[in-house]
């Protein structure tokens, strides 16, 4: 499995009707900087760390 993020969700574009609540648009591109502990846990697959 290559890239898991949905391809139709483009950061910087406006949130269209297809990108409603729950598509991961708001969670994925929230621009808050991560703390060090969160950055450590940021990888989706622990197996590859």
Swiss-Prot record:
Q: Cite a single Pfam family from the UniProt record.
A: SspO
Under which name does UniProt file this protein? Small, acid-soluble spore protein O
Please give the family membership noted in the entry.
Belongs to the SspO family.
Q: Which UniProt keywords apply?
A: Sporulation
GO annotation (BP), single: sporulation resulting in formation of a cellular spore
| Main localisation | other
Compartments, as annotated in UniProt = Spore core
Query: What does UniProt list as this organism's lineage?
Result: Bacteria, Bacillati, Bacillota, Bacilli, Bacillales
One GO CC term, this protein: endospore-forming forespore
Task: Respond yes or no to whether keyword Signal is given for this record.
Answer: no
Description of what induces expression: Expressed only in the forespore compartment of sporulating cells.
Region Disordered: start-end pairs: 1-49
């Amino acid at each position: 499995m290559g890239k898991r993020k949905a391809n139709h969700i483009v950061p910087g574009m406006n949130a269209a009707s297809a990108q409603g609540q729950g598509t991961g648009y708001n969670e994925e591109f929230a621009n808050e900087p991560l703390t060090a502990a969160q950055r450590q846990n940021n990888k989706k697959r622990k197996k590859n760390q």
